[in-house]
């Protein structure tokens, strides 16, 4: 049983397969587990195991996702594969399965297709940092020149979406032949994984990032001062350190004079901890839910941004009718609803559309009525009367 051998002393990286329907994403995922299983680094997952992905719910949105784990000599991987295009859109936008990098699967028999482009754009918009290309079904193309042309086309496509098209590794594979155990194609899967090891950077750990905690509640403790509670999203905060309060009103600085967790006093709080932070010189009226406490200067408040948004279908509890430019919903950001306006939008392929239908994937420009601590890649929900009607990710900050 390979299960016993999984060690947790290797760095952990989250990846996934993306690309056009029927280009072999799931077959390739199965092939990776088949090849690595021979070295005791994975459990064999067959196409049917992966394809029958259970439904998951993330922020009320139903997504089908298969999770596979395996390891190489240097890393441990969690790999996500989605059966349908809509599942990818939802997955990448909600961040249900965060990806540190992705394997773009493109069939040599077809070349890049509509969803190949859409997935590259999505990867760019939601901030997937690195890609590796698996040129699949190469066993079905006899002419080496055709394969070279497809590779060139993919590289140009990647460059057009601001990925380093000339430098991204492109590996010729055949998922099917590798599963069937043909040595030449098994070696190609190993080559692919070596490329993934080498070119998908190791993610920075949450504790190593600059401190950020979204305020969930505020209390006043007589004789001691004001306490803000919440879950530390990233970084570390130590007693005596200066932090900045950002969002809703003008940013201001304060010093953390105490860190409490489960009624015990600590020297520091770190990413993942639910804590109360005692703040010097701050009145209860000065801070509120929706603000964030951060390492000074590490994040700034903004009102205007662009986002990639998935609009829920009626069956998912979304709207029953379309909306138009000028629509004013609430944007739920971290811990609070902020009213805003969707001033403009374009369709998934960048074309202009008059209205947005439930089930659409759009790029939109939003403007909030008050500034909120915002950064690229930040997730948000769009709500109307307390129910979620869309999920989004910030792709550009305007002002």
UniProtKB/Swiss-Prot annotation:
Keyword GTP-binding assigned: yes
Enzyme Commission number(s): 3.6.5.3
Main location: cytoplasm
Segments for region (G1): 19-26
Binding site for Mg(2+): 26
Lineage top rank: taxon: Bacteria
Ranges where the record places region G3: 81-84
GO molecular function, one term: GTP binding
Pfam short name (any one): GTP_EFTU_D2
Keyword set includes GTP-binding: yes
Localization (cell): Cytoplasm
UniProt keyword annotations, A-Z: Cytoplasm, Elongation factor, GTP-binding, Hydrolase, Magnesium, Metal-binding, Nucleotide-binding, Protein biosynthesis
Residues covered by region (G5): 174-176
HAMAP family, per database record: EF_Tu_B (MF_00118_B)
Protein known as: Elongation factor Tu
Upper classification of the organism: Bacteria, Bacillati, Cyanobacteriota, Cyanophyceae, Synechococcales
Gene that produces this protein: tuf
């Amino acid at each position: 049983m390979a299960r016993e051998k999984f060690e947790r002393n290797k760095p952990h990286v989250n990846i996934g397969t993306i690309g056009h329907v029927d280009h072999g994403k799931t077959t390739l995922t199965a092939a990776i587990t088949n090849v690595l299983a021979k070295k005791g680094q994975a459990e064999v997952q067959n196409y049917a195991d992966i394809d029958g992905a259970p439904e998951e719910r993330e922020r009320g949105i139903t997504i089908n996702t298969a999770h596979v784990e395996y390891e190489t000599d240097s890393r441990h991987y969690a790999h996500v594969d989605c059966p349908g295009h809509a599942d990818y859109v939802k997955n990448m936008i909600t961040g249900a399965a965060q990806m540190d990098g992705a394997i773009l699967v493109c069939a040599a028999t077809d070349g890049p297709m509509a969803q190949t482009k859409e997935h590259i754009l999505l990867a760019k918009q939601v901030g997937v940092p690195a890609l590796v290309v698996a040129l699949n079904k190469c066993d079905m193309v006899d002419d080496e020149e055709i394969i070279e042309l497809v590779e060139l086309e993919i590289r140009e496509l990647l460059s057009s979406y601001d990925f380093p098209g000339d430098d991204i590794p492109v590996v010729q594979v055949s998922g099917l032949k590798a599963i069937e155990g043909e040595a030449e194609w098994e070696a190609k899967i190993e080559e692919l994984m070596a490329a993934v090891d080498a070119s998908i950077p190791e993610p920075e750990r949450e504790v190593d990032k600059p401190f950020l905690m979204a305020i969930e509640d505020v209390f006043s403790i007589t004789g001691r001062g004001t306490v803000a509670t919440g879950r530390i999203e990233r970084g570390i905060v130590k007693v005596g350190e200066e932090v900045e309060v950002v969002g809703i009103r003008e940013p201001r600085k304060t010093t953390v004079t105490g860190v409490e967790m489960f009624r015990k006093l600590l020297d520091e709080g770190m990413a993942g901890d639910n804590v109360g932070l005692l703040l010097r010189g701050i009145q209860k009226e000065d801070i509120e839910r929706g603000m964030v406490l951060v390492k000074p200067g590490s994040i700034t408040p903004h009102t205007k941004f662009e986002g990639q948004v998935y609009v829920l279908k009626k069956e998912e509890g979304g709207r029953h009718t379309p909306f138009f430019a000028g629509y004013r919903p609430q944007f739920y950001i971290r811990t609070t609803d902020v009213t805003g306006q969707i001033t403009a939008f374009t369709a998934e392929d960048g074309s202009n559309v008059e209205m947005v239908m439930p089930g659409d994937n759009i790029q939109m420009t939003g403007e909030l009525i008050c500034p909120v601590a915002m950064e690229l890649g930040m997730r948000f929900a769009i709500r109307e009367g307390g129910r979620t009607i869309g999920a989004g990710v910030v792709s550009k900050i305007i002002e």
